[in-house]
Protein backbone atom coordinates (compact mmCIF):
# COMPACT_ATOMS: atom_id res chain seq x y z
CA UNK A 1 0.00 0.00 0.00
CA UNK A 2 1.06 3.54 -0.66
CA UNK A 3 1.88 5.70 2.34
CA UNK A 4 1.02 9.35 2.05
CA UNK A 5 2.46 12.41 3.74
CA UNK A 6 0.36 15.03 5.51
CA UNK A 7 0.36 18.17 3.38
CA UNK A 8 0.49 20.49 6.39
CA UNK A 9 2.69 18.90 9.07
CA UNK A 10 4.65 16.34 7.03
CA UNK A 11 3.75 13.28 9.12
CA UNK A 12 3.43 9.92 7.34
CA UNK A 13 -0.14 8.59 7.09
CA UNK A 14 -1.12 4.95 7.37
CA UNK A 15 -3.39 3.70 4.58
CA UNK A 16 -7.05 4.25 5.47
CA UNK A 17 -6.42 7.06 7.96
CA UNK A 18 -6.48 10.84 7.77
CA UNK A 19 -8.62 13.23 5.78
CA UNK A 20 -8.68 14.16 2.11
CA UNK A 21 -9.25 17.81 1.14
CA UNK A 22 -10.24 18.46 -2.49
CA UNK A 23 -10.24 21.98 -3.92
CA UNK A 24 -12.60 23.14 -6.67
CA UNK A 25 -9.82 22.94 -9.26
CA UNK A 26 -9.37 19.22 -8.52
CA UNK A 27 -6.14 19.37 -6.52
CA UNK A 28 -6.07 17.04 -3.51
CA UNK A 29 -4.38 17.40 -0.13
CA UNK A 30 -4.07 14.66 2.50
CA UNK A 31 -4.23 15.73 6.15
CA UNK A 32 -3.47 13.62 9.22
CA UNK A 33 -5.81 15.35 11.68
CA UNK A 34 -8.44 18.02 12.15
CA UNK A 35 -5.68 20.21 13.65
CA UNK A 36 -3.85 20.21 10.31
CA UNK A 37 -7.10 20.61 8.38
CA UNK A 38 -8.21 23.68 10.35
CA UNK A 39 -4.78 25.33 10.16
CA UNK A 40 -4.75 24.78 6.38
CA UNK A 41 -8.29 26.19 6.07
CA UNK A 42 -7.26 29.28 8.05
CA UNK A 43 -4.48 29.92 5.54
CA UNK A 44 -1.59 29.36 7.92
CA UNK A 45 1.78 28.45 6.46
CA UNK A 46 3.47 25.24 7.66
CA UNK A 47 6.90 26.90 7.76
CA UNK A 48 5.62 29.49 10.25
CA UNK A 49 4.00 26.92 12.53
CA UNK A 50 6.48 25.58 15.09
CA UNK A 51 5.09 22.04 15.49
CA UNK A 52 5.27 21.09 11.79
CA UNK A 53 8.20 19.41 10.04
CA UNK A 54 8.89 22.51 7.94
CA UNK A 55 8.55 24.77 10.98
CA UNK A 56 11.16 22.79 12.90
CA UNK A 57 13.58 23.20 10.00
CA UNK A 58 12.99 26.97 10.01
CA UNK A 59 13.66 27.14 13.77
CA UNK A 60 17.04 25.45 13.29
CA UNK A 61 18.02 28.00 10.63
CA UNK A 62 17.10 31.01 12.77
UniProtKB/Swiss-Prot annotation:
- Superkingdom per UniProt: Archaea
SMART domains, from UniProt?
A: TRASH (SM00746)
Quote the record's binding site residues for Zn(2+).
6, 9, 32, 36
Biological source species: Methanosarcina acetivorans (strain ATCC 35395 / DSM 2834 / JCM 12185 / C2A)
Swiss-Prot/TrEMBL GO biological process terms = translation
* Similarity section: Belongs to the eukaryotic ribosomal protein eL24 family.
Q: What is this protein called?
A: Large ribosomal subunit protein eL24
Q: Which UniProt keywords are given for this protein, alphabetically ordered?
A: Metal-binding, Ribonucleoprotein, Ribosomal protein, RNA-binding, rRNA-binding, Zinc, Zinc-finger
Q: What does this protein do?
A: Binds to the 23S rRNA.
What cofactor does this chain's UniProt record say it requires? Zn(2+)
Q: Which InterPro entries match?
A: L24e/L24_sf, Ribosomal_eL24-rel_arc, Ribosomal_eL24-rel_N, Ribosomal_eL24_CS, TRASH_dom
Cellular component terms per the entry's GO annotation? ribonucleoprotein complex; ribosome
- Cite the cofactor comment: Binds 1 zinc ion per subunit.
